[in-house]
């Protein structure tokens, strides 16, 4: 079998070329992916918290991974309900968190690695939430570098982003690129595994659990539709004009600089140039010119997604 790096590189290339995946489920039989997944989970100490069955990663071995692979090979693997706990938020309220069993966490991390490798090259450059090498700081850098001359800012907060995800829509979106019914069934079963609260079983009719390793990448795949809508519909529809007309104040100071230069008054020209540096060259109120900017990001500490639109 190919090693994990080769498998993920092939998926990245297919994603970059927007080619469909037809045998993604077979990659779940690759032991090297489980070794990589176990290392990723082990590096995140919070991810080692046991789920409802009390299982931990301490007893992880190639033999145990082999048993998981055999169960997946014959579609006998059964995902367990997540253990629901509550953690405090800054507001004083409690946020529900789903803790999957350790085996489910391992399988979930392998699925996450495969999905991230394939979909990451296809995501919008305006998306900064739950992505490698991206976050709030890269979103702010984009705003600082690109959004000059902005007059209005509109901020939107998609509350309960993970909890409101529609399972059927999610699977349909995946099915557009992933032509592998076994893989899609596994994702559907993962979404519908339910949770235990006070040892009572509850169904999950919508959403993916906060605390699940696959939840961030699934939410990005889901919300990529919103990003593409903003890029292909909203931004072209709102865009008007090629360049702003010159700011009257900027033009006035520029004319004064020219006059001072003609009169040989270097000190006045130098002072006027310094003054002009604080004046926008373009007229921000030009009605024949407008642009719409869009960025989406997420708070890694509080799993919620935010949108910024500038005009």
Task: Show where each model-derived region lies.
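Non-catalytic terminal/accessory segments
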Residues: 1-311
């Amino acid at each position: 079998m190919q090693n994990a790096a080769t498998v993920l590189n092939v998926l990245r290339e297919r994603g970059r070329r927007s080619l469909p995946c037809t045998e993604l489920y077979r990659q779940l039989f690759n032991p090297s992916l489980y070794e990589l997944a176990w290392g990723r989970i082990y590096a995140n100490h919070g991810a080692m918290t046991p789920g409802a069955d009390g299982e931990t990663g301490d007893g992880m071995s190639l033999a145990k991974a082999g048993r998981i692979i055999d169960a997946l090979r014959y579609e006998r693997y059964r995902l367990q309900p997540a253990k629901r706990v509550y953690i405090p938020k800054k507001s004083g309220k409690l946020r529900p968190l789903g803790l999957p069993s350790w085996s489910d966490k391992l399988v979930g991390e392998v699925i996450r690695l495969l999905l991230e490798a394939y979909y990451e090259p296809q995501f919008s450059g305006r998306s900064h939430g739950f992505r490698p090498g991206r976050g709030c700081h890269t979103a702010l850098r984009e705003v600082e570098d690109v959004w000059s001359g902005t007059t209005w800012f509109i901020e939107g907060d998609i509350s309960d982003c993970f909890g409101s995800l529609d399972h059927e829509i999610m699977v349909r979106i995946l099915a557009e690129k992933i032509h592998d019914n076994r893989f899609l069934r596994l994702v559907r079963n993962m979404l519908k595994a339910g949770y235990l609260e006070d040892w009572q079983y509850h169904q999950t009719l919508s959403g993916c659990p906060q605390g699940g390793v696959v939840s961030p990448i699934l939410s990005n795949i889901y919300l990529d539709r919103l990003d593409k809508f903003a890029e292909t519909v909203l931004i072209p529809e709102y865009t008007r004009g090629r360049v702003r007309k010159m700011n009257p104040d900027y033009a006035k100071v520029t004319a004064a600089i020219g006059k001072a230069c003609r009169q040989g008054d270097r000190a006045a020209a130098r002072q006027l140039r310094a003054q002009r540096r604080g004046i926008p060259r373009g007229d921000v109120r030009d009605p024949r010119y407008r642009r719409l900017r869009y960025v989406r990001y997420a708070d890694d500490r509080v799993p919620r997604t935010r949108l910024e639109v500038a005009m």
